[in-house]
Amino acid sequence: MKRQLIIGVMGGGTAAQTDVDSAYKLGALVAENNWILLNGGRNAGIMEASAKGAIKNGGLTIGILPDATNTNTSEYIQIPILTGMGNARNCINILSSNVIVACPGGAGTISEIALALKNQKHVICMNFDIGTIFDKYKEFIHHTKKPENAIEIIKSLTAI
């Protein structure tokens, strides 16, 4: 039996409204493709928006949370995984995802990109300029400005 794709959507807990809107649309498109959306599970920013987009469009969401309690968990996360691991949970986010979409964020998002590339996972940077620091891994890095294009890249990478 073929497993469903798990799309990791990484990004900041604080984000510009345009990035929140794009994350919502991305979540909706992930759901429409019958993929599972995985993110950091928080009730803010990119995490909240992408999960909301997926749920509102019939998707399944998994949140890998840094805490040992549900205090800051998004209401749009159906399967919260409480780790109590803090930022170390980023390893679970990345290793559990088939493809990563990195939305604007901070050091946490950069660490997730680094972990993904180190593990030879493809990263789609959506409206997120990561500069040249990861040029060594350019075969795994893809850039787009639109959620629809991110979906097309995922399909081409996974031969769907």
PLM regions and their residue ranges:
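Hydrophobic beta-strand segments of well-ordered beta-sheets in folded domains
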Residues: L5-I7, K121-I124
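Flexible, glycine-rich phosphate/dinucleotide-binding loops
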Residues: A16, N70-T71, T132, A150
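Short acidic-hydrophobic, aromatic-tinged amphipathic segments that line or gate anion-handling sites
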Residues: P80-G84, M126, I141-I153
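Acidic, glycine-centered active-site loop in nucleotide-sugar glycosyltransferases
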Residues: K136-F140
